């Protein structure tokens, strides 16, 4: 009798708890079902490649298969819906008219992607929106003014020459094969440390920042993998996974380096004996530190760390990829390489000194740089979350809340926009051809109010690097080890870029 009473006493609460849990599961299932039906309705006017009912297009998204994207662009020349699992979809666009409308708006960045970035870099220009973004942008823009960048030419040239000295020591025969991306990555890090942070690290020689470079690469891989893995969208599942644990450890590495840079610069400024009190330093970090000193509430310690993280990461990674791909393209196309070298010699001589004005004269080399950025854009896509409905040129509309991805790769490889898009043809960028082209056909640095703040710095770095490299070496591809793409936040070479280097003895 007593057992029966106890069973009755506990059975009802357990029954109610079970019913409550079941109701929650059913409510969540209904919510997801309605979300999927809404997405299917909104995206029904837009054809696209078939998607797996559960995985969506994850196979295509996770394989770094740019050829598959090229095939999709051929079949669907403006846009297509891309499913990430059964309940999440992005809308990919790669048509200049679509891009023009998309970039003219002020929609916020894709929130989920930038939530993934925040633990690594904080909330800086890359992932801020609204008034806070505008405040940071206005504050940092002066650091990239032409008058501030001109003195950087000598600094960049010095860092490139350090790398070339290493290559010359490695060069022992008529032709030496070198994996160039690793060296170029350290060189661009050296440049950003000097030009933006006022730090003489000698990182190309002493290897002090190798763990930082490795951490940025691995973080990029994890972020990209998580973005397109439906199961890892849930924070708890991700944090309990091996990748989640690795992500947290790598984030600590990034923050340690950032904190050291900030503290070292503060000490330098504190101990600096000013010869001219009216002279103000205009390097990036000093501008940020000055802003914080004026109003710490408007620009906090977190803001400071976020901007240093953002520019340290973005400032060297994309540049390293661009220079490496430029070298590879010129190695594959020796006739263009020779023409660039001839132009560079006629302007720079032996390259012992380089000026801003001389770099501006390198018209054919600049066209080769732009063609490389078209063929292999360093940032393959950008994304926004629509704050209000978007009406496309064909009259169809997308609702607020939809995530739109502008595929810069797709745009630059769209045969409806570019003739023979796979062919390396620098003459696409003559003044006549550029004037006849849609203004949004070529977007390596994006466009509109949120374009890349450092694009002038990046172009300067590309010109200095390629000029000095071609003056000292002839490059040819190692056809036994062709590079593969690693499409994360930056389009890197997955296993490096191997080139045959032949020293030009007249230099």
UniProtKB/Swiss-Prot annotation:
Q: Which InterPro entries match?
A: Cyt_P450, Cyt_P450_CS, Cyt_P450_E_grp-I, Cyt_P450_sf, Cytochrome_P450_Monoox
What's the encoding gene here? Cyp4x1
Keyword Hydrolase assigned to the entry: answer is no
Per its UniProt entry, what is the enzyme's top EC class, as one word?
Answer: oxidoreductase
Annotated GO biological process: lipid metabolic process
- Function according to Swiss-Prot or TrEMBL: A cytochrome P450 monooxygenase that selectively catalyzes the epoxidation of the last double bond of the arachidonoyl moiety of anandamide, potentially modulating endocannabinoid signaling. Has no hydroxylase activity toward various fatty acids, steroids and prostaglandins. Mechanistically, uses molecular oxygen inserting one oxygen atom into a substrate, and reducing the second into a water molecule, with two electrons provided by NADPH via cytochrome P450 reductase (CPR; NADPH-ferrihemoprotein reductase).
The free-text tissue note of the record is:
Expressed in brain and aorta. In the brain, expressed in the Purkinje cells of the cerebellum, pyramidal neurons in the dentate gyrus of the hippocampus, cortical forebrain neurons and those of brain stem nuclei (at protein level). In addition to neurons, also expressed in cerebral vascular endothelial cells (at protein level). Also expressed in epithelial cells of the choroid plexus (at protein level). Hardly detectable in heart, lung, kidney and spleen.
Official protein name in the record: Cytochrome P450 4X1
């Amino acid at each position: 009798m007593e057992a029966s009473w106890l069973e009755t006493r506990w059975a009802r609460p357990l029954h109610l708890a079970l019913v409550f849990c079941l109701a929650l599961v059913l409510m969540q299932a209904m919510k997801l079902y309605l979300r999927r039906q809404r997405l299917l309705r909104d995206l029904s006017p837009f054809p696209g490649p078939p998607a797996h009912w559960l995985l969506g297009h994850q196979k295509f998204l996770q394989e770094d298969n740019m050829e598959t994207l090229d095939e999709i662009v051929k079949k669907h020349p403006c846009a297509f819906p891309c499913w990430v699992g059964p309940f999440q979809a992005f809308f990919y666009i790669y048509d200049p008219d679509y891009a023009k409308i998309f970039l003219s708006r002020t929609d916020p960045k894709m929130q989920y992607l930038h939530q993934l970035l925040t633990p690594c870099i904080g909330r800086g220009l890359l992932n801020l929106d609204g008034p806070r973004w505008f405040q940071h942008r206005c504050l940092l823009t002066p650091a990239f003014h032409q008058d501030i960048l001109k003195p950087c030419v000598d600094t960049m040239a010095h860092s490139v020459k350090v790398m070339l000295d290493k290559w010359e020591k490695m060069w022992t025969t008529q032709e030496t094969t070198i994996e160039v991306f690793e060296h170029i990555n350290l060189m661009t890090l050296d440049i950003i440390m000097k030009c933006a942070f006022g730090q003489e690290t000698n990182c190309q020689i002493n290897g002090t920042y190798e763990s930082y470079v490795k951490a940025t690469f691995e973080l990029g891989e994890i972020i990209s993998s998580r973005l397109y893995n439906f199961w890892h969208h849930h924070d708890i599942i991700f944090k309990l996974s091996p990748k989640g644990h690795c992500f947290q450890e790598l984030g600590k590495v990034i923050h340690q380096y950032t904190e050291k840079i900030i503290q070292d610069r503060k000490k330098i400024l504190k101990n600096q004996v000013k010869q001219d009190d009216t002279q103000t330093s205009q390097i990036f970090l000093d501008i940020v530190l000055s802003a914080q000193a004026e109003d710490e509430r408007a620009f906090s310690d977190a803001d400071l760390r976020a901007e240093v993280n953002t520019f340290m990461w973005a400032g060297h990674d994309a540049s390293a990829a661009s220079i490496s791909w430029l070298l590879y393209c010129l190695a594959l196309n020796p006739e263009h390489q020779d023409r660039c070298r001839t132009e560079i010699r006629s302007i720079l001589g032996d390259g012992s000194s380089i000026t801003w004005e001389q770099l501006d004269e390198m018209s054919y080399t600049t066209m080769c740089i732009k063609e490389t950025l078209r063929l292999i854009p360093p940032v393959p896509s950008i994304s926004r979350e629509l704050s209000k409905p978007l009406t496309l040129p064909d009259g169809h509309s997308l609702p607020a809340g939809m995530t739109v991805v502008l595929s810069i790769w797709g745009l630059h490889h769209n045969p409806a926009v570019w003739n023979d898009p796979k062919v390396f043809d620098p003459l696409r960028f003559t003044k006549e051809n550029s004037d006849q082209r849609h203004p949004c056909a070529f977007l390596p640095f994006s466009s509109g109010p949120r374009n890349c703040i450092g694009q002038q710095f990046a172009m300067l770095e590309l010109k200095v690097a390629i000029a000095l490299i071609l003056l000292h070496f002839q490059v040819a591809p190692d056809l036994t080890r062709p590079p593969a793409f690693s499409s994360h936040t930056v389009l890197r070479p997955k296993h490096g870029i191997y080139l045959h280097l032949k020293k030009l003895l007249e230099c």
